Amino acid sequence: MTAEDSTAAMSSDSAAGSSAKVPEGVAGAPNEAALLALMERTGYSMVQENGQRKYGGPPPGWEGPHPQRGCEVFVGKIPRDVYEDELVPVFEAVGRIYELRLMMDFDGKNRGYAFVMYCHKHEAKRAVRELNNYEIRPGRLLGVCCSVDNCRLFIGGIPKMKKREEILEEIAKVTEGVLDVIVYASAADKMKNRGFAFVEYESHRAAAMARRKLMPGRIQLWGHQIAVDWAEPEIDVDEDVMETVKILYVRNLMIETTEDTIKKSFGQFNPGCVERVKKIRDYAFVHFTSREDAVHAMNNLNGTELEGSCLEVTLAKPVDKEQYSRYQKAARGGGAAEAAQQPSYVYSCDPYTLAYYGYPYNALIGPNRDYFVKAGSIRGRGRGAAGNRAPGPRGSYLGGYSAGRGIYSRYHEGKGKQQEKGYELVPNLEIPTVNPVAIKPGTVAIPAIGAQYSMFPAAPAPKMIEDGKIHTVEHMISPIAVQPDPASAAAAAAAAAAAAAAVIPTVSTPPPFQGRPITPVYTVAPNVQRIPTAGIYGASYVPFAAPATATIATLQKNAAAAAAMYGGYAGYIPQAFPAAAIQVPIPDVYQTY
C-alpha cells in the first residue's frame, strides 16, 4: 500500500466515523448542519422514532422525577419547513426545555405541529401567554396552548356487582402503571356500580399502552369482552382561581335525598353559612358564603354517610369564562362553528309515535342539539367519559345547559320561525329511468324546514358524472319534481283513472294533508292484502325507498291528470289500499321513525 492509498483510507475512515456520529433522523435532513450546530451548542440529544423527532428528554444534567402534569404545551400552525434550529431559540427564551417533540412526515418535512415540555409548570403557562400568535416567519403565526396529557381510560362492560378493589386488582393484572380506579355507584342501587369505571395511569404512555392491550378482541375480563376508550381528561384549573372557590361538589347522594337535608347537613358547623343547594339526580352543588366554611365542611363531611350513602365531597371546578362563551356561541350555531346542513328538529311530529321523522334520533347532530341533548346521552358513559368528544363544561353538552320545561314552545318562538327556502341539490341534472318519467332534483320548498337548518346532510360531490347520478338517486332524492313525458301523460292518466275508480273511492274534496310522509305502506302494513292491480299509480309513479324521507311527490304539470291519477287527492300520493280495509293512518306502520 502506498502513502497515497493509506491517506485515502484514513480519510474515508474518518468520514465514516463522523457520519456515524450523526443521529438517525438528523442525517440527510435539509438543515442537517443547523441541527448539528444546535445540538453542539445546547448539549441536547436528538433522535427520530415513531414519526416524531425528539429533542432532549431529559436535558443534560437532569436529576429528579419527570416534570409534573401541565408542563407541556401544544404548538400548531408551524410552517412545514421550520425545524428545531428555529423553534428551540424561541421557546427556550421563556424557560428551560425538558423535551421538544416535532411531528415528522416521510418526506422529511414537519407535519405542522409539535409538543414542548418545560421543566416547570409556570414556564409552560408563560409560553402560552407570551408565544401564542408569535410570528415565526413573516405573516406566519404560531398557535400555542396547553397540552392535555390524558392519563385516564374509560372501561365499559364491567359487571355491576364488582367493587372498586376487585376492578383495580383485575386491571392491574393485565396492564402496568395503574394508579387509581374511579367507580361510580348506581343512582338507584348503591350496592351496584354503573357498569363502567375510569382507570388512572401514571403517564400518558402507560395509558396508551394499556388501551392498545385492552382493545376488544384481545383480552377478556370477567369472562366477556369490555369496551375501552380515552376518557375526557380532568379540567386543569389555575391554582389561583381554585383558591377563590366557595362551592362544593357533592356526589353519590341518594335519589330521595332532598336539598333541605343537604343544606341542614352542610350547615351544621356554622348556621347560615350555606347560601343555597342545587341537587341534580344523585349529585349536588352547595354554595357557601365564605371559602373557609366550604373547606371546613368538605374536610368534615367527605367520606361520611348521609341517609345510608357515603358522600364524596370536593371543591367545584369553575369553568373558564372565555371558553364557556366560545362553547355557547358554537352551540347557538355562530362563531367558528358554522352551522352544517343538518335537520331541523321542528320538522313534522308524528302524533302516533311522538317521533320527529326526517332524521333518526340516535344521531342527533347539528346546531340545535343543545336544546335537546344532555351530556352523555349520545353514548351514555356518564361524567368524564369519552362519549362526547366536544369540549364543554361538565354536566353540559357543547357548553350548553338543558333547557328544561317549556323548551319546545320557546324553540318554536325562536329558531322554528325561519324563512323557508328552496334547495337545489344538483343543478341541471336529469336522471333517466326505466319508465317514461325523467326525475329531476328540483328547487323545492319543504314546509317547516328553516332556511339555516336543512334536513339534507352535506356530502362532497362525486368526481365522475355517472357516480354523481347514482349518488343523487341513492342519497339526495328526497325533494323531487316528477315531470311526466307529455306523450304518455294522457294514456297514463286514463289508465290510472280507470284503475283508481275500481279500487279507490271517489273523493270530491281532498282531505287535509296528514302531516306525515305518504308512502306505499301496503308493503309493510300488517294483515292487509296487497292490491293486485300493478298499474294503479300509472307510469309516472315514483316509489320512496326510505319511509324516513318526509317528502311530498308532486306533479308539476297537468293538474287534471294529477287529480285523476291519484284518486282525487290532487298532488298527494294516497294510501294504496281500499279505505274500507283498514283505518288510516296506521299507527304501527311508522314505528321505524
UniProtKB/Swiss-Prot annotation:
Q: Which cysteines are joined by disulfide bonds?
A: none
Q: Give the protein family.
A: Belongs to the RRM RBM47 family.
Induction conditions: Up-regulated by interferon.
Which BP terms from GO are recorded?
3'-UTR-mediated mRNA stabilization; cytidine to uridine editing; hematopoietic progenitor cell differentiation; mRNA processing; positive regulation of interleukin-10 production; positive regulation of type I interferon-mediated signaling pathway; regulation of alternative mRNA splicing, via spliceosome; RNA splicing
What's the protein called, per UniProt?
RNA-binding protein 47
Q: Which Gene3D superfamilies match?
A: 3.30.70.330
Subunit: Homodimer. Interacts with A1CF. Interacts with APOBEC1; form an mRNA editing complex. Interacts with RBPMS.
Q: Name one GO molecular function term.
A: enzyme-substrate adaptor activity
Q: Where is this region: Disordered?
A: 1-25
In the record, Asymmetric dimethylarginine modifications are located at R394, R405
* Purpose: Single-stranded RNA-binding protein that functions in a variety of RNA processes, including alternative splicing, RNA stabilization, and RNA editing. Functions as an enzyme-substrate adapter for the cytidine deaminase APOBEC1. With APOBEC1 forms an mRNA editing complex involved into cytidine to uridine editing of a variety of mRNA molecules. Through the binding of their 3'UTR, also stabilizes a variety of mRNAs and regulates the expression of genes such as the interferon alpha/beta receptor and interleukin-10. Also involved in the alternative splicing of several genes including TJP1.
Q: What is known of its domains?
A: The RRM domains are required for mRNA stabilization.
Q: Which UniProt keywords apply?
A: Cytoplasm, Methylation, mRNA processing, mRNA splicing, Nucleus, Repeat, RNA-binding
According to its record, what are the GO cellular component terms?
apolipoprotein B mRNA editing enzyme complex; cytoplasm; nucleus
Outcome after substituting F115A:
Loss of function in regulation of alternative splicing. Loss of pre-mRNA binding activity. Decreased homodimerization
Looking at the Swiss-Prot or TrEMBL record, what is one Pfam family this protein matches? RRM_1
- What NCBIfam families would the database entry show? hnRNP-R-Q (TIGR01648)
Q: Which domain of life is it from?
A: Eukaryota
Which intervals carry biased composition (Low complexity)? 1-20
Residues where Omega-N-methylarginine is found: R332, R394, R405
Corresponding gene?
RBM47
Q: Kindly list the places in or outside the cell where this protein is found, as annotated in its UniProt entry.
A: Nucleus; Cytoplasm
The RRM domain is annotated at 71-149, 151-233, 246-318
